[in-house]
C-alpha cells in the first residue's frame, strides 16, 4: 500500500531513508533549510530517486496541512528541540510522529520521547527508528535491519509493513528508553571515532570503539 511521508531534515540518514521510501513507491516530501540538493554532502550516497522536486523549505512547514502523512524527524540531536519549538503549530496538528533522531534534549536533559509527549498532548503515537546501520548501506541495498520502538502495536505494524523489502526490515520493540540510551551511546562512539581518526591514522582505533559501543 502506498503511504505518504514527510521527512523533516535532510542529513545523510534523512536523504537515504527518503530515497529508500521513494524506491518502494511511496510519496515523500522532504523539508529542510537548504533546498539545494547540490550543496549537501552526499558524495558517499547513491541516491537514485530523491530530487529537488521532493524538497521543500522548512520555513513553509507551519503552513502545511496534515492529511494523514507519516512524519519522520531526521535532524541532528542538537536541532531536535529547535524543530519542535519553531514549528509548534504544525506538530500540534499531528496524532503520530516517528524519529530517526536519538538522544537527550540539550536543555532539559529529557529523553526525546518524553520531550515530545510533554510538549504535545495531541501526539498519541511515537516511534523511534534505530540501527546499528549506515545510510550508505541502505542506498547500496545491503541487507540491514533496524529497530522500531513504539508502544502502539498498530503503529508498529504500519511502519514495518510500509518499509519492508528484501534487504531492509524493521524489528518491532516496545523498549523506547532502552533504544534511546543505545542511541546516546552510539552518538558518543561516533564522536570518539571522529576524534580518533583526526589524531591518529584513520581506522586504527575506530573499529575498537565501535565494537565496545
Ranges and model annotations:
Residues 56, 63-143, 159:
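Rossmann-like NAD(P)(H) cofactor-binding subdomain of soluble oxidoreductases
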Residues 1-55, 60:
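NAD(P)+-binding Rossmann beta1-loop-alpha1 motif at the extreme N-terminus of oxidoreductases
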Amino acid at each position: 500500500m502506498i503511504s505518504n511521508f514527510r521527512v523533516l531534515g535532510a542529513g545523510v540518514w534523512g536523504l537515504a531513508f527518503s530515497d529508500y521510501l521513494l524506491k518502494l513507491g511511496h510519496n515523500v516530501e522532504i523539508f529542510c533549510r537548504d533546498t539545494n540538493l547540490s550543496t549537501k554532502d552526499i558524495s558517499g550516497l547513491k541516491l537514485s530517486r530523491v530530487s529537488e522536486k521532493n524538497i521543500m523549505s522548512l520555513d513553509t512547514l507551519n503552513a502545511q496541512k496534515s492529511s494523514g502523512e507519516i512524519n519522520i524527524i531526521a535532524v541532528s540531536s542538537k536541532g531536535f528541540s529547535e524543530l519542535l519549538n519553531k514549528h509548534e503549530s504544525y506538530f500540534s496538528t499531528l496524532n503520530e510522529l516517528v524519529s530517526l533522531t536519538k538522544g537527550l534534549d540539550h536543555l532539559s536533559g529529557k529523553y526525546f520521547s518524553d520531550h515530545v509527549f510533554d510538549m504535545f498532548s495531541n501526539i498519541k503515537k511515537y516511534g523511534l527508528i534505530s540501527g546499528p546501520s549506515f545510510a550508505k548501506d541502505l542506498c547500496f541495498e545491503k541487507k540491514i535491519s533496524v529497530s522500531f520502538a513504539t508502544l502502539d502495536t498498530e503503529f508498529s505494524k504500519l511502519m514495518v509493513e510500509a518499509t519492508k523489502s528484501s534487504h531492509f526490515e524493521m524489528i518491532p520493540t516496545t523498549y523506547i528508553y532502552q533504544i534511546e540510551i543505545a542511541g546516546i551511546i552510539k552518538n558518543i562512539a561516533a564522536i570518539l571515532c571522529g576524534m580518533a581518526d583526526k589524531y591518529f591514522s584513520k581506522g586504527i582505533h575506530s573499529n575498537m570503539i565501535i565494537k565496545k559501543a
